[in-house]
Design a protein with these regions (language model features):
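Second-shell loop/turn segments in exported
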Residues: 89-101, 117-119, 192-195, 227-234
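Envelope-exposed proteins and targeting segments
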Residues: 76-78, 116, 127-129, 200-205, ...
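Surface-exposed patches in mature extracellular/periplasmic domains of secreted proteins
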Residues: 115-128, 255-263
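Surface-exposed short loop/turn segments
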Residues: 134-214
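Bacterial N-terminal signal peptides
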Residues: 8-19
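Compositionally biased, intrinsically disordered linkers/stalks adjacent to structured regions
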Residues: 243-291
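Short secondary-structure boundary motifs at beta->alpha junctions and helix caps
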Residues: 24-25, 186-192, 196, 205-259
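A structural "domain/chain start" motif
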Residues: 22-104, 125-129, 133-146, 272-291
């Protein structure tokens, strides 16, 4: 097993300089629209579709330490302060002209966390958690560059796999790249995840630490939620808010495996269309996640 995966995981850790930010909500309360599941096929490229379909993944890793902490709920909220790590471009770095406003993302993040039972600490309320979040793009190499630098191109794939499904999925995909004969799982979900790791994507990462541990310079990860979306045919202004909205069902909830999701985005809004969850077989209908 290559040693690259633990090294790659370092980029997900919180920085030493922590700036506490509490955003004041200023958008409509309705940030998510759910409905019955369906999948629509279009011959038009995403860039020309009125409501382009988003191909997303969601995953949360929970540490043993995190399992000892209180579970957040609407009745028993967990309070936090937040550090905005900002935009981070990775892989074959590309310049993006359409980037969402930091204040808009902070607002949406606060409200999606609230749906999951996490509230910002205000006034005398002491925070239990320090949340660190950052977002950006992770792009693959073009074929010519990948031929010249195959090892670096491979490392980029593993980095994207880490964002998609954590160390276990990154390790499994690494083994498949080393031995293509191991690729025996060609279910809809398995192919979806593999394609996601091979292609350009946008991502959002939210990591949770116990606030007192950070204050004493002994941060230990509690949980980390990572969301990705294939970036072809959509810009960051469309992709990032959608990821943050969908993350509400993943914060602080351990994932046994990465979730593969398809959903359309309503152009010009932050509302999402019906959700389709891809299972390890033919796609099936499933209730939309709770608001």
């Amino acid at each position: 097993m290559r040693s690259i995966i633990p090294l790659i995981a370092v980029f997900l850790l919180v920085g030493s300089a922590l700036q506490m930010i509490v955003a004041a909500p200023n958008l409509s309360d309705e940030i998510d629209e759910t409905g019955m599941n369906r999948h629509t096929f279009s011959l038009l490229p995403k860039a020309f579709q009125k409501n382009p379909e988003l191909e997303m993944t969601g995953f949360t890793v929970m540490t043993d330490y995190g399992k000892t902490q209180p579970v957040a709920s609407l009745k028993n909220p967990v309070y936090y302060q937040i550090h905005n790590g900002g935009e981070q471009l990775r892989g074959e770095i590309t310049t993006y002209s359409e980037v969402p406003a930091a204040a808009v993302l902070a607002d949406m993040l606060e409200r999606s966390l609230a749906v999951a039972g996490y509230q910002p600490a205000k006034g005398p309320q002491k925070p239990a958690l320090l949340l660190n979040y950052f977002w950006g793009a992770h792009d693959r190499m073009d074929s010519d560059t990948a031929e010249k630098f195959p090892e670096l191109a491979r490392n980029y794939v593993i980095e994207r796999a880490l964002l998609i499904g954590g160390k276990d999925y990154a390790r499994r995909l690494s083994e498949e790249l080393d031995r293509p004969s191991l690729v025996i799982d060609h279910t809809l979900k398995a192919d979806f995840l593999r394609d996601q790791a091979m292609d350009d994507l946008y991502y959002v990462v939210v990591s949770a630490y116990k606030f007192d541990d950070v204050a004493h310079h002994k941060p230990q990860l509690l949980w980390r939620t990572t969301m990705t979306v294939n970036s072809h045919g959509i810009n960051m202004v469309q992709g990032m808010p959608a990821l943050i909205v969908m993350a509400k069902d993943f914060y602080g909830r351990q994932s046994t495996q990465p979730m593969a999701l398809r959903r359309d985005v309503r152009t010009g809004t932050v509302k999402l269309g019906p959700l389709e969850i891809l299972e390890s077989g033919p796609s099936v209908s499933a209730p939309s996640p709770s608001k």
